[in-house]
Amino acid sequence: MVKHSRGNRTRSRKLLKKSPRERGAVPSLGRLMLDLKEGERVVIKINSSTHSGMPHRRYQGKVGTILGKRGKSYEVKVKLGDKEKILIVRPEHLNQIKA
């Protein structure tokens, strides 16, 4: 018997699927150059066509706050159960919440 692999994208067939209109589209320049301030609230929306800076699928749809910037990525604090996690996520995978 062969041991079944459990990679980072297992069980994500529907979760990371794009709609036919979005398929093949690369993130727009505005989305890549998104300037987020510390303390802003964001939603993690994974863009499956960009692999760098992609958070784990368990964080898809979670709301977090920006702690700071680390290189091209942002540090995002997310509450998961009763714990708080700090993720390092690229801006392609973040959506700003309009206040």
Swiss-Prot record:
Keyword set, alphabetical order: Ribonucleoprotein, Ribosomal protein
Q: Which domain of life is it from?
A: Archaea
Q: How is this protein annotated for GO cellular component?
A: ribonucleoprotein complex; ribosome
Q: Looking at the Swiss-Prot or TrEMBL record, what is one Pfam family this protein matches?
A: Ribosomal_L21e
What NCBIfam families does its record include?
PRK04306.1 (NF003303)
Q: Which InterPro entries match?
A: Ribosomal_eL21, Ribosomal_eL21_arc, Ribosomal_eL21_CS, Ribosomal_eL21_sf, Translation_prot_SH3-like_sf
Record-linked Gene3D superfamilies: Ribosomal protein L21
GO BP terms: translation
Q: What family name appears in the similarity comment?
A: Belongs to the eukaryotic ribosomal protein eL21 family.
Q: Which HAMAP family match?
A: Ribosomal_eL21
Q: Name one GO molecular function term.
A: structural constituent of ribosome
Composition-biased stretches, type Basic residues, lie in 1-18
- Return the annotated region ranges for Disordered: 1-26
Q: What is this protein called?
A: Large ribosomal subunit protein eL21
